[in-house]
Amino acid sequence: MRVADYSFELPDELIARYPTAERTASRLLSLDGNSGQLADLQFTDILEQVNPGDLMVFNNTRVIPARMFGTKQSGGKLEILVERMLDDKRVLAHVRCSKSPKVDSIVCLDGGYEMVMLARHDALFELSLQSDKTILEVLEEVGHMPLPPYIDRPDEDADKERYQTVYNQNPGAVAAPTAGLHFDDAILAALKAKGVNTAFVTLHVGAGTFQPVRVDNILDHKMHSEWAEVPQTVVDLIGETKARGNRVIAVGTTSVRSLESAAKASQGVLQSFSGDTDIFIYPGYQFQVVDAMVTNFHLPESTLIMLLSAFAGFDEVKNAYQHAIAQKYRFFSYGDAMFVTKKAN
């Protein structure tokens, strides 16, 4: 199980650095996991891919403006990327600067705010805000949207809206659940009118989602941990959907991982779930919950393309990606989408 098997060459011009003018203006590549059949569609054609009674499960996390800039006491510049909010004052964060800040040192943020460096946990720093305000209030005031490295441009005002789903609810993600970016209020209303049911889980996407896999063998990879919640109401809806013979369609790999984490935590019988998950899905995994998924095009050698290969078949996904590149689909967070049905076990 070599990581290199998931490598592919992507022309730089296919990396989407800006979203389409309208959320639903993206293209949609349909992949049937069983037959490997592909179809080139528009995103609005997703209405033809779903059936009345199907259940679409969305991740309602809200991206926080997690990137802050400031200086150390020495005057050296630094950049802080919040990975997780521990409470109203404390965060775990990545800190980029010439020399790591020491324990008990003060970090001065833009806007005049200060944070104290409490401890270091491997690559992450625990920082505490010295203010009457909450960390979320300060982030909303001085933070920047944490665009992924491959977008390769500073964040702009428009990103505050477009790097966020229209149904976001629970603040805590430092990366968008990007499959959801294609949905606007009109298409959600059209799905409802067709009789498609919707449900919401939460997974606060961490910066680890962009970390490259640094081992040669997939089995040696240690997955990053993220907080997820699957409410009992969603569990009940899934049970009703399956009993009718309808499909559970996960919008995004984060929704897939949330649902499969809930099943894994209760030994395959789906129950409500709230807590950290480091589930790593790669070929050989037996899916317990999800029948189809909406997803964007992922980075080479990423855990997300491994998840997709587990879902729809290694050869089928490889062929789909070659087709997408040849047809000049737009890749990654602001790019186009796929609608994928599961390959039978």
Curated annotation (Swiss-Prot):
One of its GO terms (molecular function) is S-adenosylmethionine:tRNA ribosyltransferase-isomerase activity. It catalyses: 7-aminomethyl-7-carbaguanosine(34) in tRNA + S-adenosyl-L-methionine = epoxyqueuosine(34) in tRNA + adenine + L-methionine + 2 H(+). Its main location: cytoplasm. InterPro entries: QueA, QueA_dom1, QueA_dom2, QueA_sf. GO terms for cellular component: cytoplasm. Its EC number is 2.4.99.17. GO terms for biological process: queuosine biosynthetic process; tRNA wobble guanine modification. Keywords: Cytoplasm, Queuosine biosynthesis, S-adenosyl-L-methionine, Transferase. It is found in: Cytoplasm. Pathway: tRNA modification; tRNA-queuosine biosynthesis. Transfers and isomerizes the ribose moiety from AdoMet to the 7-aminomethyl group of 7-deazaguanine (preQ1-tRNA) to give epoxyqueuosine (oQ-tRNA). Monomer. Belongs to the QueA family. NCBIfam families: PRK00147.1 (NF001140), queA (TIGR00113). This is S-adenosylmethionine:tRNA ribosyltransferase-isomerase. It comes from Shewanella pealeana (strain ATCC 700345 / ANG-SQ1). The gene is queA.
